[in-house]
């Protein structure tokens, strides 16, 4: 539970990682100075840095993302949904919706007994391609940020090729 007298703040940090990767961190902290100091330290060790407010936010847009198993639905049914796009993967589909349509699409699928995993979050408008050789630095940074107690969500725009 919460400790009496401790106030938590939601904070968004915009950062650059190695290879020009854009990163947005959604944080919840009781000590902004400690959190920003720890984030700067993690970033600098990986060749990244903390940016100014607004420096990478424009590279992302809010979207609903829903992942469903191919076994749960026929591909033709996807065209009847209020989705913007869908991606076909090995064993599942990844659906993209507007934030406004996310709830309706999720409810429709659940009524049809389709198991869903989904959320409304920040999706990159474009991605930065990272070669397999350069990927370890970026993946290591993402893991360190993800493991930080005050960081609730990590959004980035890289794609390993």
How would you label these PLM feature ranges?
Residues 1-24:
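Translation machinery proteins
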Residues 3, 43, 47, 113, ...:
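Structural signal for hydrophobic packing residues in well-ordered secondary-structure cores
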Residues 4-6, 43-50, 69-76:
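A general structural motif
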Residues 10-18, 50-60, 113-125:
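Flexible hinge/switch segments at interdomain interfaces of large molecular machines
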Residues 17-21, 30-33, 60-62, 89-91, ...:
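Short flexible coil/turn linkers enriched for glycine and charged/polar residues
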Residues 22-28, 124-128:
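Short hinge/gating elements
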Residues 26-51:
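Acidic-enriched and Gly/Ser
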Residues 62-161:
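Positively charged, low-complexity, intrinsically disordered RNA-binding extensions
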């Amino acid at each position: 539970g919460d400790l009496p007298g401790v106030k938590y703040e939601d904070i968004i940090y915009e950062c650059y990682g190695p290879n020009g990767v854009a990163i947005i961190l959604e944080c919840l902290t009781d000590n902004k100075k400690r959190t920003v100091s720890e984030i700067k330290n993690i970033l600098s060790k990986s060749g990244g840095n903390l940016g100014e407010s607004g420096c990478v936010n424009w590279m992302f847009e809010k979207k609903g993302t829903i992942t469903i198993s191919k076994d749960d639905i026929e591909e033709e049914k996807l065209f009847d949904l209020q989705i913007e796009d869908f991606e076909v993967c090995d064993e599942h589909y990844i659906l993209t919706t507007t934030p406004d349509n996310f709830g309706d699409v999720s409810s429709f699928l659940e009524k049809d007994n389709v198991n869903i995993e989904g959320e409304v979050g920040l999706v990159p408008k474009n991605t930065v391609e990272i070669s397999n050789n350069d990927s370890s630095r970026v993946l290591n940074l993402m893991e360190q940020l993800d493991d930080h107690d005050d960081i609730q969500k990590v959004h980035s725009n890289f794609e390993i090729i």
